[in-house]
């Protein structure tokens, strides 16, 4: 039996799909969720213990540590699927040959380089490479009517993105490169693409959700997705949803051909009255993975693998709406069992999650959008209430 290694920040959802396929599955995951399937060949980086804090993800996560601890698995595996947190470019040339997916993503993961690649062909926000905040402020003074954000040229999940203003006290991390980008206000959207050597096709469009959608606090941290994209799921009145979907499908496929994307990939957009803006490409299995599986009732890991092996994959039509919402802890709290059937990525009971760290994920499906939205939002209220009941004093 061929050996398949899943490696990244959280392998739970992919592991569930992989175990339905004919592989000897290996897994290295940073997070240790209590609902992650237990398998023989498994490494968990984050040790969760009773009455102990799981810490701050940004401070503790280190992709090099994951790769170092996975050396034996990497050597033994026939195939490797890196997910969020691990770049294909982190692997040696020899090990890159084992990757099911894109092997060289340097033109995409470097967001400034990506912008330079697409600026003449696609609608994208104006972007500048900067050395410091003062330089960003000087550039912005030339266009006083334009808002700008500062973001790292590498990274995902909406972390370390800040809205610039002239009295900004933004601190840039030493040793990290940043860029200044025109801030496009509008509706966050995304496409899921499936590509092989011979074809590229958009399989689903979705409403992308950030913290700003719920709190209007200029936070760009990823919260989740709702799909498929319809007049209801876009959560805003728009003139022609069919036209938006068509433009997203065409643009996503053009990007997939331009960068020769294979397997499952994603494209993030912002849509407003001026049109559709390309924000970034995610050249790996993306956060919509589980929602797409629930909506289509199909194994998307199987589809990803077959596409990477240049097999034709028939994608069914959406059968359900699906909604994913990550709950970030409203306070420092000690996790206690919550009796809901639509919560995933659960902490171990008795462990402590710090304020604003990911607590768990709500994922559900329904053929009726309003019922689905009410179910997820009701679960969200319950989870936040339970977290506050079990609040812990700050250290």
What are these regions (language model features)?
Residues 1-109, 134, 377-378, 384, ...:
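ATP-binding N-terminal substructure of ATP-dependent carboxylate-amine bond-forming enzymes
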Residues 25-26, 124-125, 178, 323:
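Hydrophobic anchor at the start of a short beta-strand
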Residues 97-165:
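A conserved helix-loop-beta module that forms one wall/lid of the active-site cleft
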Residues 118, 140-163, 176-191, 203-207, ...:
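ATP-grasp fold ATP-binding core
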Residues 165, 195-200, 271-275, 309, ...:
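Short acidic-glycine loop/turn motifs at beta-strand connectors
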Residues 185-189, 193-260, 282-306, 317:
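ATP-dependent carboxylate/phosphate-activation module, predominantly the ATP-grasp catalytic core
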Residues 253-290, 327, 334-335:
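Conserved metal-phosphate-binding beta-hairpin within the catalytic cores
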Residues 302-395:
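Peripheral (often C-terminal) accessory segments that flank ATP-dependent C-N-forming ligase machineries
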């Amino acid at each position: 039996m061929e050996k398949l290694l899943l490696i990244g920040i959280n392998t739970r959802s992919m592991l569930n799909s992989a175990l339905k396929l004919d592989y000897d599955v290996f897994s290295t995951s940073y997070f240790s969720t209590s609902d992650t399937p237990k398998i023989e060949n498994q490494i968990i980086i984050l040790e969760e213990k009773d009455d102990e804090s799981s810490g701050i993800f940004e401070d503790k996560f280190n992709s090099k540590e994951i790769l170092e601890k996975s050396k034996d698995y990497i050597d033994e595996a026939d195939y490797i699927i890196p997910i969020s947190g691990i770049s294909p470019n982190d692997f040696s040339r020899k090990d890159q040959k084992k990757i099911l997916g894109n092997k060289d993503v340097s033109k995409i993961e470097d967001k400034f380089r990506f912008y330079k690649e697409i600026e003449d062909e696609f609608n994208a926000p104006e972007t500048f490479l900067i050395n410091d905040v003062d330089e960003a402020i000087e550039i912005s003074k030339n266009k006083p009517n334009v808002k700008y954000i500062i973001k790292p040229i590498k990274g995902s999940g909406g972390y370390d993105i800040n809205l610039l203003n002239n009295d900004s006290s933004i601190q840039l991390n030493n040793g990290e490169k940043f860029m200044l980008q025109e801030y496009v206000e509008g509706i966050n959207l995304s496409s899921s693409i499936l590509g092989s050597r011979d074809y590229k096709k958009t399989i689903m469009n979705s409403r992308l959700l950030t913290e700003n959608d719920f709190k209007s606090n200029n936070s760009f941290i990823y919260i989740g997705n709702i799909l498929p994209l319809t007049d209801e799921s876009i959560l805003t009145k728009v003139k022609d949803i069919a036209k938006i979907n068509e433009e997203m499908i065409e643009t996503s496929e053009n990007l997939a051909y331009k960068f020769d994307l294979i397997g499952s990939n994603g494209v993030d957009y912002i849509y407003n009255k001026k049109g559709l803006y390309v924000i970034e490409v995610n050249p790996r299995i993306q956060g919509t993975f589980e929602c797409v599986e629930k909506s289509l009732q199909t194994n998307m890991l199987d589809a990803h693998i077959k596409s990477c092996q240049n097999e034709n994959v028939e994608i069914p039509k959406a059968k359900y709406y699906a909604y994913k919402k990550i709950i970030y802890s409203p306070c420092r709290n000690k996790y206690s069992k919550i009796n809901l059937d639509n919560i995933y990525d659960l902490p171990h009971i008795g462990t402590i999650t710090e304020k604003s760290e990911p607590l768990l994920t709500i994922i559900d499906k329904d053929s009726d959008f309003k019922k689905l939205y009410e179910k997820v939002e009701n679960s969200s209220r319950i989870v936040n209430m339970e977290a506050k009941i079990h609040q812990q004093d700050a250290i």
